[in-house]
Amino acid sequence: MAKIIAFDEEARRGLEKGLNTLADAVKVTLGPKGRNVVLEKAWGAPTITNDGVTIAREIELEDPYEKIGAELVKEVAKKTDDVAGDGTTTATVLAQALVREGLRNVAAGSNPMGIKRGIEKAVAQVTEKLLEAAKEVETEEQIAATAGISAADPAIGAQIAKAMYAVGGGKLNKDSVITVEESNTFGVELEVTEGMRFDKGYISGYFATDMERLEAVLEDPYILLVSGKISNIKDLLPLLEKVMQSGKPLLIISEDVEGEALSTLVVNKIRGTFKSVAVKAPGFGDRRKAQLQDIAVLTGGQVISEEVGLSLETADLPLLGQARKVVVTKDDTTIVDGAGSEAQIEGRVNQIRVEIENSDSDYDREKLNERLAKLAGGVAVLKVGAATEVELKERKHRIEDAVRNAKAAVEEGIVAGGGVALLQAAHVLDNDLELSGDEATGVRIVREALTAPLKQIAANAGLEPGVVADKVSQLPQGEGLNAANGEYVDLMAAGINDPVKVTRSALQNAASIAALFLTTEAVVADKPQPAGAAGMPGADEMGGMGGF
């Protein structure tokens, strides 16, 4: 395909225009008075959301240079979402502010590499200041406040805090397993069930059943546990046929699934003949065997292993485990409500406790405690209901974000919310870090950009951004604007806080992309095809698949 190339100012301005288009659509959602954005879908009802990364994913621009600019900012939102689970809109607003100020200085003759170094040094100092200011989360009320802000509903925040305590063994734990399900009832209900999550995802992306969320959801599946590798489909075929006749999906957990066995499962999944997901077993060596046995006890199945005289060819349905639901992403697998007996699970838990007491190795004890938490902790299920499907999807998305937000708060602590932590951390840059020239310019760009989230929150609340930023900069540490009612308060005392992990990630990712923008000297893009040239001749007549 032919390419088009833009250089210098033309290249950077094209990228900036794409960034601004995306950022302007996203930033209206920031803060308690933020608005919603309606996203049209190819089929079904439109989605209404105030989640930055969801909005960013939907934006596709026509101009090739603008499209690249928008894609770069999408990366900021996606990376922040992946790392922290929230803060995507803040990251986008920061990126826009950094790029706008940076390009203005580059156009005026500043050296982009000097500015880049200044930005990096300033961000490192601000990050350090944020981590120093962070307070550890110690109470259920603090988690409820953090999650409640993310979900824009204090009642949901309280349910999430309750869920974290319920499956964390009576204490806050960032590894608490909390899933969100759609329900036919109104409101949000909490249910704690037997279950487990381990950090292995699907072997092939083709197993995903929900392409938008890139996850595979199996309802009431059989679970096949195998200690070795599966590569020969002939070994697996007799069991597959029995599972197919039962009409249930199948989750396979083994050392690996490869070759013709994997390709057969994928082809049948794509054709809709048989729904299955293959996942690598967690751990290595003896730990893998032990964890497979944990899953077997939890699901009421048996591990197929030659050590106990069981083989795939002779395996039957009674050897398979079962669960109410299994959710598999690219990174982890969650088993909800396994069919194992209470007595066997309790016996396994006691056995692990004895092993912990008898172990001399700190590392072994740590791994055994992880297994104990997974087996004994269970899974908290938040069931979400709403009047319409559109509202239900939006609510579910908000709650999932709030859960990840709460976990981030437990992990690294919390700082004052509402954009105030960033603005007040900017004081560390007051003397330009004693740098000079273009590096000092980079520091000043960061200092100015750190006011952008607070200004946007104020603007969305109908207040004058400059006046609010000036007022907050003069307030004592931790005090700032409560945009919900327009009052200036002690934000931590009022329960208005953000996980420092979210704030830190938003700044670091925004600065990373801004540095790329400023140091770009050429952009190579695909040349747009003339209208009507994109379709292949005869594709319609052949059904678009060559007649197969």
From Swiss-Prot:
GO cellular component: cytoplasm
Function recorded in the entry: Together with its co-chaperonin GroES, plays an essential role in assisting protein folding. The GroEL-GroES system forms a nano-cage that allows encapsulation of the non-native substrate proteins and provides a physical environment optimized to promote and accelerate protein folding.
Cell compartments where the protein resides: Cytoplasm
GO biological process: protein refolding
Keyword Isomerase: yes
Assembly and interaction partners: Forms a cylinder of 14 subunits composed of two heptameric rings stacked back-to-back. Interacts with the co-chaperonin GroES.
Matching CDD domains: GroEL (cd03344)
MF term (GO), any: unfolded protein binding
Pfam families: Cpn60_TCP1
Name of the featured protein: Chaperonin GroEL 2
Protein family per UniProt: Belongs to the chaperonin (HSP60) family.
Organism of provenance: Corynebacterium glutamicum (strain ATCC 13032 / DSM 20300 / JCM 1318 / BCRC 11384 / CCUG 27702 / LMG 3730 / NBRC 12168 / NCIMB 10025 / NRRL B-2784 / 534)
Binding residues annotated for ATP, in chain numbering: T29, L30, G31, P32, D86, G87, T88, T89, T90, G418, N482, A483, A484, D498
PANTHER family: 60 KDA HEAT SHOCK PROTEIN, MITOCHONDRIAL
Protein keywords: ATP-binding, Chaperone, Cytoplasm, Isomerase, Nucleotide-binding
Catalytic function, reaction form: ATP + H2O + a folded polypeptide = ADP + phosphate + an unfolded polypeptide
E.C. number(s) listed in UniProt: 5.6.1.7
Superkingdom of the source species: Bacteria
InterPro entries reported for this sequence: Chaperonin_Cpn60_CS, Cpn60/GroEL, Cpn60/GroEL/TCP-1, GroEL-like_apical_dom_sf, GROEL-like_equatorial_sf, TCP-1-like_intermed_sf
